[in-house]
Amino acid sequence: LPTARRESSLQTFLPTLNLKYTINDANSIRFSASRTVTRPSFIEMAPFLYQESYGSAQIRGNDELQNGYNYNFDLRYECFGKNGDMISLTGYFKYLDSPIERIQALQGGATLHSFRNADNGMAAGVEVEFRKQLIKDLRLGANLSYMYTNVKLPEGGAYTNKERPLQGASPILANADLTYSPRFGEERQLNLALLYNLQGSRIHAVGVSNLGDIKQQTLHTLNFSAGYDLNRHFSLKLQVNDLLNRNVIFKQEVPSTGTEVEVERYKKGTDFEIGFSYKL
């Protein structure tokens, strides 16, 4: 059988710079800059058709994908209080060289998804985060971010929208967690956590050849975890994912009318994990 071989260089210069200015014991400012690499995954590069666990589209990898390079700049203000309380404000900017995006096309009347490198793109946004102890052993944490993205497409390409947000990037992201962690003696501890996530509408697959972009609609998820340390060695864990079990909904733009139509919806279901661990 014929085989294809693809080699990717691991010799990449990835510098990082971190600076911190301490205003006083409670307040500080941090600045960071870095160059990172996004390498194509095996699934994104494998040149054969496969079916995802969820959804109806078939996917074919692209063995001509190139590494994407990211230039990241972050400025963060932090204020710390008593009992681990904290509030922070972060502004960030990212320049994306050859970002990898998921695209769609029609093949024999069926929808086919694959992957391509865009020319370049950018992302800029702000994030607010806080942690607060409400009462003893009960803590609340949350963060909210807004992000603007834009991508430049190859000249003469078949993309339907010549200017648009970056595929896979949600403009609004929010997370909140409520944790309760009482101790019973020196070794036993209970850990309960309720975790909420909001992911704003985002492009799931980029439209080409007059096909509109497919967008995943805003999604809310709620998870629960519980753990109990019996002693220094033994612990129990329970994880419940997606308590809300909301529909994952996809809508596609219709370029000729400027409207959207629903093309797919499914539920992933609620799943449970129970674990037992032993530490030496």
Question: Which residues does each predicted region cover?
Answer:
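Outer-membrane beta-barrel strand-turn architecture
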Residues: 13, 21-25, 69, 79-83, ...
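C-terminal beta-signal and adjacent terminal beta-strands/loops
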Residues: 96, 197-206, 228-280
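Outer membrane beta-barrel strand-and-loop segments of large Gram-negative receptors
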Residues: 60-62, 66, 72, 79, ...
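Structural signature of Gram-negative outer-membrane beta-barrels, strongest in the C-terminal barrel
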Residues: 1-96, 179, 195
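Residues on the lipid-exposed face of transmembrane beta-strands in outer-membrane beta-barrel proteins
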Residues: 17-21, 75-79, 126-132, 142, ...
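Transmembrane beta-strands of outer-membrane beta-barrel pores
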Residues: 33-39, 46-48, 79, 93-97, ...
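Gram-negative outer-membrane beta-barrel transporters
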Residues: 92-95, 114-205
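Repeated loop/turn-to-beta-strand initiation elements of outer-membrane beta-barrel proteins
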Residues: 26-29, 83-87, 137-140, 185-190, ...
